[in-house]
Amino acid sequence: MMPFYRSVSTRTRSVPLIAAVCFFASAAPCVAAVDDSGKYLFICTGDQARKSPDFLAVVNFDERSSQYGRVIGKADVQGASATGNEFHHIGMSADGTTVVCGGLLSVLKSQDQIFFFDVSNPRAPKFHSSANPPLSAITDDFQSLPQGGFLVTMMGGAQGHSPGRVAEFNGQLELVKEYPETPPAEGFNPHGISLRPEVNLMVTSDFICPSTTLDAVAGGLDFRGSVRVWNLRDRTILRTIEIPGAGGTIDVKLIPGDPSERGYTAGMLDEHLYLLDTRRGTAKAVFDFATISKGGWPQLLRLTRDGRRLFISMNQAGKVAMLDISRPDEPRLLKILELGANSGPHYIALTRDEKRLIISDYFLNQDGFGKVHAEGDHKIHVAVVTSNDLRLDQRFQLDFNTAFAQGAARPHGVAVLERTYAHD
């Protein structure tokens, strides 16, 4: 990506050893490893008034720091596409030097909709460039690629209708192509994405026809209920898992290491967790979120690397649920984290050590031009994670209504820097 620092594979516990070697080495200059892992939190943020530029915020995420939980940096989008993008999901490059934010509603102003930031110096990020795939719009989720670059779900076509696409960017942040070559004619509005490169597998989940969320389009919201199973290497769709009545399969995650190549999605309106059989193309309801809170809108999923724990945000319920999925067809509720009425949790992210879960309280408010009004309270929460519990870290207090001089801001995608790099 943008090689300000050279990436190395040294683990955190090796840093003191390297420092010692440098100290005792002879006159030759020595390169030490510096570990930024878990010290910086990036947040894709929109101006609530839609007048000031959208921006990437940097928060001190070092638990040992006196500035823990404070905004310490900010980079505005530059140029003609700076405002009104509705910053949405976030991605971070495999080498930790680039952050990308998606403009969910950029298409409404006919402007660029994917925004790259150089975070080589995490305390002072810089806007790098923007892009506008010609065949698609409504930028949603990002999946970094090990060789550099990203896969990006684009929920709509160029005018925000169906079909959408999956766009690919290479390590130089250049658009490679939009997939598939010939997309499904009906219901292809990809939002969630998950990969297992070791078994050549990708899945995407269809959520909603974006144009139906606008006041200018008559009628109600046209939710989707389907998951696409892809050949990752060829970027082609192998089969579709239909889930009639799901009411919006907003996210999808493959179970890490699962020999049967299964995964999960959730129906936002029917409130069920579905176990997906990607080989047979079937889905089975295995948990009912209405038992936690009816009408709670289960949304984004995160799984631990061992495939034994699942976290899900419940936007309208003001909760985050933690499930034991060690038996994938029989999930068991472990903990409900209560964030309060009108909190509106949506985006969630686990740290690499899986000891902290970050939660942002904002989904989408289309203000005076659309049908979706899920504002939330604009707070960022951190929960301490153990094998069977979630509890709020009371030291971390961050409210985007008051954090910036320009006024209230809407925080959405969050990502923690996990990087060790060489330093002279």
Label the predicted regions.
Residues 78-95, 134-148, 184-200, 244-262, ...:
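Beta-rich, blade/repeat-based domains predominating
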Residues 57-61, 112-120, 163-173, 219-234, ...:
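Beta-propeller blade signature
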Residues 68-143:
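Blade-loop segments of beta-propeller domains
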Residues 112-113, 119-197, 208, 212:
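Asp-box/WD-like beta-propeller blade repeats and closely related beta-sheet repeat scaffolds
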Residues 36-38, 43-50, 101-112, 152-164, ...:
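Short, conserved, GDST-rich strand-edge loop motifs in beta-rich repeat architectures
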Residues 294-380:
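Loop/turn-rich, solvent-exposed surfaces of beta-rich toroidal or solenoidal domains
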Residues 71-81, 123-132, 175-183, 236-242, ...:
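A short beta-strand motif characteristic of beta-propeller blades
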